[in-house]
């Protein structure tokens, strides 16, 4: 039930973002439409641990609160398979923050670095890998 609720909330957030211009694709590279995605990846490996419940209910909401109105929405992925169902998962989890201003994101994280970093040990023994991307386009499936 909780998984369905999270999925519905994610869909609501996505369509809320996309509904601003439902008649066209949103090109984030256009002035005023900038959107950045900060991906936090937790690689799988021998001896790696990850408490998804804590990450979902405590860590990500705490960091989201630090980002204020700059945060558009966030996502949490739980790895379930690799390239094929038999392959090990490459990442135990991936968290995403979608923000309008990457400088404001960096400032908020820098100002709260100790709180964010010190909380990591509460849910994992993995050193996360961070990637910042510019979202270039958000499209909806026209076949539906």
Language model features with spans:
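Bacterial Sec-dependent N-terminal signal peptides
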Residues: 1-28
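Macromolecular interaction modules
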Residues: 20-144
